[in-house]
Swiss-Prot record:
GO terms for molecular function: G protein-coupled receptor activity; photoreceptor activity. Residues 58-69, 130-148, 225-246, 304-349 are cytoplasmic. The keyword Metal-binding does not apply. It comes from Columba livia (Rock dove). GO terms for cellular component: membrane. The chain crosses the membrane at residues 33-57, 70-94, 110-129, 149-172, 197-224, 247-270, 279-303. Its main location: membrane. This is Pinopsin. Produces a slow and prolonged phototransduction response consistent with the non-visual function of pineal photoreception. The lineage of its organism: Eukaryota, Metazoa, Chordata, Craniata, Vertebrata.
Length: 349
């Protein structure tokens, strides 16, 4: 195909358009594309396995189907869709060195990755809010029921649709980004149309959920510390408090590590059109955010002992490896287990 026919490139250039042919060595060396393909391949396999396990185990074991666990399944579904619609597409494109599926599917990929990514992001915020309401009891003796959980899950999808559909209708757009093997919101063009959308997206889909997470977990930690202070200051209690603190810090840091580089890059590029950023460097925040689909279920689900028990029973065909026969011996609950399950819910507190 004649590269001068591509609408993405000015005439008289030897660089193919992002949908026309390999972008190496014009954007980056071929080795860079293959390295990203390897990373995306690892993410696709790992995220598909861990999120698939979360969904299957939650469906199979009734005791995991509590209202407070709905949001964890919602998060796993969103992460699985990001993997299927984003990471797998990026894997194929990086092997070929360009966006092989064409402009229309570029827009669809950008939309689907943004939609499901923001659903996952807001799922983390709703989970934090649920933990705050259940543990800190600002509403008194309020119990989450199925309708509350369904409402929370529905909100994440409706809110995300509200802010990811406009680029399909003319308010900004979805375009190839970085190495030009994945698509996302148009941070690059500038102008009031794009800048107003980027600013709105930043506030509604990053600042707001981050504020909710920080508020909820800060109050949760203070409540748990106050409860621990009323108990005997034994080594076990202190260990439980330290473990919960580390878990909360891990949750917040995982959120920031995933989304802060991406949003920072977007704002810098959107507000400084003259800045020159290497394509490989510009791609890092986007690809790095996709790795959250692997560690989200590990932090929020696999660290919960009740889920671990159900997972082991399923993988071992009903036989618990830590016990004899088909059931595991009951172990007394420790303060560590109790406080940890307040942060990563397996059942209402």
């Amino acid at each position: 195909m004649d590269p001068t026919n591509s609408p993405q490139e000015p005439p008289h250039t030897s660089t193919p358009g992002p949908f026309d042919g390999p972008q190496w060595p014009h954007q980056a060396p071929r080795g860079m594309y293959l390295s990203v393909a390897v990373l995306m391949g690892i993410v696709v396999i790992s995220a598909s396995v861990v999120n698939g396990l979360v969904i299957v185990v939650s469906i199979r074991y009734k005791k995991l189907r509590s209202p407070l666990n709905y949001i964890l399944v919602n998060l796993a579904m969103a992460d699985l869709l990001v993997t299927l619609c984003g990471s797998s597409v990026s894997f194929s494109n990086n092997i070929n060195g360009f966006f092989v599926f064409g402009k229309r599917l570029c827009e669809l990929e950008g939309f689907m990755v943004s939609l499901t990514g923001i659903v996952g992001l807001w799922s983390l915020a709703i989970l934090a809010l649920e933990r705050y309401v259940v543990v800190c009891r600002p509403l008194g003796d309020f119990r989450f029921q199925h309708r509350h959980a369904v409402t929370g899950c529905a909100f994440t999808w409706v809110w995300s649709l509200l802010w990811t559909t406009p680029p399909l209708l003319g308010w900004s757009s979805y375009v190839p980004e970085g190495l030009r093997t994945s698509c996302g919101p148009n941070w690059y063009t500038g102008g009031s149309n794009n800048n107003s959308y980027i600013l709105t997206l930043f506030v509604t889909c990053f600042v707001m959920p981050l504020s909710l997470i920080l508020f909820s977990y800060a109050n949760l930690l203070m409540t748990l510390r106050a409860a621990a202070a009323q108990q005997q200051e034994s080594d076990t209690t202190q260990q439980a408090e330290r473990q919960v603190t580390r878990m909360v810090v891990a949750m917040v840091m995982a959120f920031l590590i995933c989304w802060l580089p991406y949003t920072t890059f977007a704002l810098v590029v959107a507000t400084n059109k003259d800045i020159a950023i290497q394509p490989a460097l510009a791609s890092l925040p986007s690809y790095f955010s996709k790795t959250a689909t692997v560690y989200n279920p590990i932090i929020y689900v696999f660290m919960n002992k009740q889920f671990q028990s159900c997972l082991l029973k399923m993988l071992c065909c009903g036989h618990h490896p830590r016990g004899t026969g088909r059931t595991a011996p009951a172990a007394p609950a420790s303060p560590t287990d109790g406080l940890r399950n307040k942060v990563t819910p397996s059942h209402p507190v």
